[in-house]
Amino acid sequence: MSQHTSQYVFNSKEDYNVILDNMSREFEERWNHQTQSPYTNLENYITRAVLGNGSFGTVMLVREKSGKNYYAAKMMSKEDLVRLKQVAHVHNEKHVLNAARFPFLIYLVDSTKCFDYLYLILPLVNGGELFSYHRRVRKFNEKHARFYAAQVALALEYMHKMHLMYRDLKPENILLDQRGYIKITDFGFTKRVDGRTSTLCGTPEYLAPEIVQLRPYNKSVDWWAFGILVYEFVAGRSPFAIHNRDVILMYSKICICDYKMPSYFTSQLRSLVESLMQVDTSKRLGNSNDGSSDVKSHPWFQGVDWFGILNQEVTAPYQPTISGAEDLSNFENFEFKDRYKSRINRHPELFANF
Ligand SMILES: Nc1ncnc2c1ncn2[C@@H]1O[C@H](COP(=O)(O)OP(=O)(O)OP(=O)(O)O)[C@@H](O)[C@H]1O
């Protein structure tokens, strides 16, 4: 499996369209070529530390035994996945991670399983979550926000071109690498669909009105969430954040787009947020045939060196301090709890294709 996110150099708009077509062909090949993980547990790796705990598993720092490379191993209990009805999501996540290759997306390096757990081996991204960094500084200035937003817009453009709806955009799912560039992670809710779907999923603060109203929706829900994300970067809070997080009240505000624009937003940022957060999807920026180009050519992005960003030549506004692969200073301290150790293979039929 290739360990490179991109072997491409991005030079011009024409080249980029050709490159995206090539990426699309390569994506299709990998999408159609899924392999079953061997029952090798983590025997090819040495576990060094816990990087984080998600709702469905633990992410550990591991080092491969045959070399010196470090990775993040996402370990998920089969029992928990069945109990929490996440079986389809985990297959989905592996499928997408295996097929997608883009500079700002996490990808699958390897996968294994054992009687109790499934393991996804991912590139180690050790600058911590964008969420934690944002919480520390509270607000980004617009230039700083634009640096991250440009990468998210390019990643959404790629995913949509591959007919993937991401459906879980939020700062918690954006990791920072050593150079301060982003890697989007967590593809459990990502769905490959060319058109519309109607499953209710995502995180309340970022749900588009059509999802809240249980209406069929398309990839423009990601552009709505992108509007929320950019707003939150600069305002330091989500537009629909409500004291005590009354979700029903939040949903009623989302449906009528009832939020306040901070007075310090520039007119270009106001215009971007307003255009993305349109209840009427026919008016929502990003929802035309040439959707991502419309977003990228919005005046707020004027002056962005798109190819410099794609090639990661632009200096990031913040570079995490990392002294080595085992430096965990950008992560909170987590404890490891290995709850299951059975002699029987749990749910072999449900995870046969994992
Ligand atoms: N590739 C990685 N490199 C470094 N740390 C990672 C990596 N992937 C995940 N982590 C850390 O582990 C945490 C949990 O990972 P992840 O969000 O994938 O789990 P999850 O169970 O899907 O979580 P969620 O609760 O968001 O559904 C992340 O927030 C991050 O801090």
From Swiss-Prot:
Q: Which UniProt keywords apply?
A: ATP-binding, Kinase, Nucleotide-binding, Serine/threonine-protein kinase, Transferase
- GO molecular function per UniProt: ATP binding; cAMP-dependent protein kinase activity; protein kinase A regulatory subunit binding; protein serine kinase activity; protein serine/threonine kinase activity
What positions belong to coiled-coil segments? none
Amino acids binding ATP: 51-59, 74
Q: Write down the EC number.
A: 2.7.11.1
| Domain AGC-kinase C-terminal: residue ranges | 302-354
Pinpoint the Protein kinase domain residues: 45-301
Task: Give the protein's recorded name.
Answer: cAMP-dependent protein kinase catalytic subunit 2
Tell me the organism: Drosophila melanogaster (Fruit fly)
The gene it comes from is: Pka-C2
